[in-house]
Each structure stands twice: as structure tokens, then as C-alpha cells.
Design a protein with these regions (language model features):
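Compositionally biased regions
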Residues: 6-8, 21, 106
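Short, threonine-centered small-residue motifs that mark membrane-proximal processing/anchoring sites
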Residues: 16-17, 21-32, 146-157
Length: 157
């Protein structure tokens, strides 16, 4: 009786494996990869981020991960949406990006750097001139800057 029961287990395992593999390929991707960069007076940053695969009603994608560097310093983390980078209290990020200009929202996205500093690029429509600005914060040294930058982000095909 044992050999007979054991032989039924192999086809069942194969069937489960086939169903599992089919399910993996049946679902669409849950993330998009982007390449981004910005440059301005005293700053150059670039890298990649991942977003959810579908935009919201305004065409913005939620940024879920980030990597790269700013002025040669490694990015170590993405600032959670709804929170402010240290040194920029009262200005929470929303972590959104889109394919059309302006690509960033008023709140932008934020990230931490390996040297203990932070950055928050955002679209400042109320600034003169309107455009993308990158707030930089160095909390230990109580320094900040906010240069106008040229920002680009594209979805990796």
C-alpha cells in the first residue's frame, strides 16, 4: 500500500508546481524602475527608484524604493510619505513622481545620505522662478540650502 500512496504524491506535487509557476507569470509586475537625476548650483544627484506600477488619478506614481548618490555620497534610505526630512519640519514629502512636467509635486520625495544629511527635491510653483528645487539639510551643522535644479526621471523600458 505504501508504494501506491507514494506514487500519487509525485503527480500532485508536479501539478502544484505547475499551478504555482503559472500564477507567477499570470500577474502583472507590481513595480516600475525609473532612472532619475538632478543638477543645480552645488548639487548633482542621480540614481534609480522603484514605484508602484499604476499611477493615481493625477498621473503620479508612488515611489517605494530609492538608490543612488548625491555629490558622491550614497543614498541610504527613502523618507516615508507623510513625514519631513530632518531639518525641514513642517514640509512632509509625498513620494510621488510622474512622466509629465512637472514631474514632482509640491511635496516631492526625500532621502537620507550616508554622511547624515538629507535631501528633498520638490516642485515649487510658488517660487520665482517656478521649478524644481532641492532642499538640502545638514542637521548636525545646522546648514540648509535650496537651489533650483533641473530634474528628470524616466521609466526604464
Amino acid at each position: 500500500m505504501c508504494p501506491r500512496n507514494g506514487s500519487r504524491g509525485i503527480p500532485l506535487k508536479r501539478a502544484l508546481l505547475i499551478v504555482s509557476l503559472a500564477a507567477l507569470f499570470a500577474f502583472p509586475a507590481e513595480a516600475l524602475e525609473w532612472r532619475w537625476s538632478y543638477q543645480g548650483e552645488g548639487v548633482a544627484a542621480s540614481g534609480a527608484f522603484t514605484t508602484k506600477d499604476a499611477p493615481n488619478a493625477d498621473g503620479f506614481y508612488d515611489i517605494t524604493g530609492i538608490k543612488g548618490e548625491m555629490n558622491g555620497v550614497a543614498i541610504t534610505g527613502l523618507q516615508p510619505a507623510g513625514t519631513s526630512i530632518p531639518g525641514n519640519d513642517g514640509y512632509p514629502v509625498d513620494g510621488l513622481v510622474r512622466t509629465v512636467v512637472p514631474q514632482l509635486s509640491l511635496h516631492g520625495f526625500g532621502y537620507s545620505l550616508a554622511d547624515g544629511t538629507y535631501a528633498n527635491p520638490f516642485y515649487g510653483d510658488h517660487f520665482v522662478p517656478p521649478g524644481v528645487y532641492a532642499f538640502f539639510s545638514d542637521p548636525p551643522n545646522r546648514k540648509t540650502s535650496e537651489p533650483l535644479v533641473k530634474f528628470t526621471a524616466t521609466i526604464v523600458p
